[in-house]
Amino acid sequence: MKLGIVGLPNVGKSTLFNAITNAGAESANYPFCTIEPNVGVVAVPDARLDKLAEMYQPDKKTPAVIEFVDIAGLVKGASQGAGLGNKFLENIRRTDAIVHVVRCFDDENIMHVVADASQNVPVDPLGDIETIDLELIMADLEMVNRRVEKATKAAKGDKKFLHEAEVFKALAAHLDSGKSARTFACDKDDRAIVETADLLSLKPIIYAANMGEDGFAHYEDNAYFRSVRDLAAREGAQVLPICAKLEQDIAELDDPEERAMFLADLGIEKSGLDRLIQCSYDLLGLISFLTYGKDECRAWTIKKGTKAPQAAGKIHSDIERGFIRAETINFDEMMACGGSVAAAKEKGLLRSEGKEYVVKDGDMIYFRFNV
């Protein structure tokens, strides 16, 4: 899974990326300090995997991972190439989802950049969101208009392309009204047509409302946050309250107990990274299954609804091709039996599942195959 972190200059985007990945991306009070996208691979925290590793003492413990990409800040006019627009838009296209960092704090020492590097205006999270949304929409409109032309031309030789042309014409009108592809209403078949265009404004989005340290524990009182939350609710998007500076402080604490105490003192249950990862999984409809043994304990990420052979294919294509069965027990069932697979087997909880089995979150699986 690859998440692109985007935002206008000076909203705290690179500070958040630094905290998440400890990659040390340059962060400064001027636009475009991130010119090439910085990439960081982050392990997905999973207490179930930790427990299995404690039980089996494997040679290797391998968590699931998320790739975060810190994409250069953009300004108004990016879809026409302003600022670092074209590079920015192409980098977004390579991601699975967008984390849009939105400034929800006041600080007179950090200028709020909108139209160009010299302009400093009052903080306006909804205006910032609109600026980036419009750039994505305008880039998509250009792409969709090309698809209309292509489908219309193809329909002269094959009438099946007529419907495709009509779908893209309707989508073009939707985009031209300033609305994102995410909000385009259509049925499942037409959605499949739309998805072939690889549109930027169709990508799932999380608004990361970046607030100051003061009062973060009571983020609901932040008027900027509330405005972003209400917008996300109307769009059906996700919103995540976060404080990038606090996340940076947390990232510098190596001791897990020290981190827990730091969070408790702030009245925060989970770090922003943990909440962002969970939010990302929910947004993209992802779950994890586990493989276990003396050689390796590992977490694997799959889409909800994935059947056993396709889950096996995540490990190796030969296992999917030669799939026989999946010996399965859910982690919670195993723990209810005293943390013993043998005890769970005695109780008949270790199941032999076939090709139609839909893998569940937390399933511990041993795949039988023959090639």
Regions found by a protein language model. Name each.
Residues 1-120, 126, 133, 144-145, ...:
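Conserved G1/Walker A P-loop phosphate-binding module
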Residues 2-6, 11, 17, 145, ...:
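C-terminal-of-GTPase-core extension/linker across diverse P-loop GTPases
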Residues 74-80, 118-123, 130-136, 155-160, ...:
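Flexible beta-alpha connector loops of hexameric P-loop NTPases
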